[in-house]
Every structure is written in C-alpha cells, then in structure tokens.
UniProtKB/Swiss-Prot annotation:
GO CC entries: bacterial nucleoid
Name of the protein described by the UniProt record: DNA repair protein RecO
Keywords annotated in UniProt: DNA damage, DNA recombination, DNA repair
PANTHER family: DNA REPAIR PROTEIN RECO (PTHR33991:SF1)
GO process terms (BP): DNA recombination; double-strand break repair
SUPFAM superfamilies in the record: ArfGap/RecO-like zinc finger (SSF57863), Nucleic acid-binding proteins (SSF50249)
Pfam assignment, any one: RecO_C
Signal peptide range: none
Assigned protein family: Belongs to the RecO family.
Function: Involved in DNA repair and RecF pathway recombination.
C-alpha cells in the first residue's frame, strides 16, 4: 500500500516504547486520525521537528480503517514560530488543538473545521492572543459540528427570543422565560454578536462589549463541557496564563 500525502495539523503525540510515537492528526482529507510513527523519536531524517503540537505538516500516511494508520514521513509546512515564541499564544494554540481532538469523530472529513483551525492559527501567528478570538473560534467550531446553542429561538418550544433575550441553563441550552424561570441572562446584544460570528469567516471583525463577552463565555464554556464529555487539560493552562496576564 502506497502512503497518501495528507495536509495535516498535529493535535497530540504519545511516546510509545523506546523510540516510537502515536500521533493524532487532523487532516483535510480524512479528518482526525491516529497514526503510528515508528522510530519517530530517533529519525530526524523522516520527521525532524514535524511532530510538534500544532505544526502544519505534509504527512505520508498509510490509512487503516478502524485502527492505527502508519505515519511514514512528515515535512513541515508551517511551524508557527510567532506562536512558539509567546507563552500566551502557545496556550491558545494548544487549547484549540485539544478541542478539535476532543470534539471530532475519527475518520470523518471536516474541511470547514480544517480551514477554521488554519485561520485561527494563522491569526495567532500574526497577532496577540485574545479571548474574543478564542470565542469566535469556539462558536464556529460548535456550529460546524452541529452543536451550537439555538441563538434565535427557544430550544424547547421554538418561540423566537424577544427583547429580553434568553436564559442560559447549566448544559449550555438557551431557553425562553416561558419555559423556565431559572438561568443566567443572555441579552439580545449577546445573542446578536454570537450570530454575527457565524456570518463571517474572518477573525478580528466582531467586537464583544464586556457584558456580552462574559455572557458568551459562559454559554460556550457550558456547551463545550457538555459535548466534550471531559475536562480539557489545556484549559487549565490557558486559564492560568490568562490570570497571570490580567
């Protein structure tokens, strides 16, 4: 079997034995896959620095359905030196990769999400990291995967949200006040900004006022925790870095 040449991002790596490595890749052609890289820790000719987390690479992979594929060789397309030189940007890039790793099915192509991750890492390479752009990435990821909260109407009864906005429940669900009397307020301004994020593919165009940013963060944190099913390790690192920079 001849290896396929795939466009890929390195999502995670796991050392195996004395010299091998298991690599999670997010590819344009096959979505998320896991591949076994034999002697990856010893062979700089075949891999070099290409297996660093969030590196964009050309991966030579023998695809195996229902098991570990074989990573034969990898060349770097972009190592993102600007991100790697800044601890804050590293934290956001690691979080984005772990989120994709946790949220996506294996072996299912997701070209829109591949382009979203590419755009986010390109943005982090060129500009300082920000919470607003993290939220832009998150809501578009949820939308692509079919998990985003209903922003126009109550998820229970279907009634369009009025000027009072919505109420946010613990699982990230947004409902009207006729369906529940409990929950965190989500104003129409917040809902409108979240919807605006879905109407442009460009980072840096949508600005969240402080209240809207806080409400958006609460909604996305709850939705992501619910759908990911476990706590992301990189999220703790991201929060630590964010607190130190305040």
């Amino acid at each position: 079997m001849h290896p396929e040449k795939l466009q890929a991002y390195v999502l995670s790596t796991l050392d195996y034995g004395d010299s091998d490595r298991i690599v999670a890749l997010f590819t344009l052609e096959h979505g998320r896959i896991k591949a076994f890289a034999r002697r990856a820790r010893n062979s700089r000719r075949r891999f070099g620095a290409a297996l660093e987390i969030f590196a964009r690479i050309e991966a030579h992979v023998e695809i195996k359905q229902g098991g570990l594929s074989g990573l034969r060789q990898a060349e770097i397309d972009c190592i993102y030196p600007g991100i790697r030189g800044d601890l804050g940007r590293i934290a956001y890039a690691l979080y984005a990769c772990e989120l994709v790793d946790a949220m996506t099915p294996e072996g299912h192509p997701l070209p829109r999400l591949f382009r979203l991750l590419a755009a986010y890492l390109d943005r982090l390479e060129a500009y300082p990291a920000s919470e607003q752009e993290r939220r832009f990435f998150e809501i578009n990821l949820l939308n692509i995967l079919g998990y985003r909260p209903s922003l126009e109407a109550c998820s229970r009864c279907g009634t369009p949200f009025d000027d009072r906005g919505a109420l946010l429940l613990d699982d990230g669900e947004l409902v009207c006040r006729a369906c529940t009397g409990h929950g965190r307020d989500m104003t129409q301004v917040t809902l409108g900004r979240m919807l605006a994020c879905l109407k442009t593919g460009t980072f840096g165009l949508i600005h969240f006022p402080d209240e809207a940013q806080a409400q958006t963060g609460s909604a996305l944190d709850r939705a992501l925790a619910f759908h990911a099913g476990h706590r992301l390790k990189s999220l703790e690192f991201l929060r630590q870095i964010s607190n130190e920079n305040q």
